[in-house]
UniProtKB/Swiss-Prot annotation:
Belongs to the universal ribosomal protein uS8 family. GO terms for cellular component: ribonucleoprotein complex; ribosome. GO terms for biological process: translation. It comes from Methanotorris igneus (Methanococcus igneus). This is Small ribosomal subunit protein uS8.
């Protein structure tokens, strides 16, 4: 059986493991998109270290949890957002102003909505975390 949305599955699994109180969990299958989203979350202090483990197939990410995530998830459909429209989606997906992140895929790579606003570029919404 193939997964329809590996990113949504990984983020849902991350939220569930965080609620249960696990310290380490594994994401299978791994992908570049999931790795880049994990890197953004690590840079902003939501997860600890993570590493890619080669298993002869798609690979596995081993992720250390530090108890900072209340909720995270994929945004479906992947809305196209212009540089001045981020506030509308902040109100929809984040619980309060300046609390949490929207992760955006832009022409310059995957980044937070704060970085995209700062650079003056739009993109497609991928996920949220707070």
């Amino acid at each position: 059986m193939s997964l329809m949305d590996p990113l949504a599955n990984a983020l849902n699994h991350l939220t569930n493991c965080e609620r249960v109180g696990k310290k380490v969990f594994y994401i299978k299958p791994a992908s570049k998109l999931i790795g880049r989203v994990l890197k953004v979350m690590q840079d902003h202090g939501y997860i600890g270290e993570f590493e890619f483990i080669e298993d002869g197939r798609a690979g596995i990410f081993k992720v250390e949890l530090i108890g900072k995530i209340n909720k995270c998830g994929a945004i479906k459909p992947r809305y196209a957002v212009k540089k001045h429209e981020f506030e509308k989606f902040e109100k929809r997906y984040l619980p309060a102003r300046d609390f949490g992140l929207l992760i955006v895929s832009t022409s310059q790579g995957i980044m937070t909505h704060y970085e995209a606003k700062e650079k003056g570029i739009g993109g497609r919404l991928i996920s949220y975390v707070y």
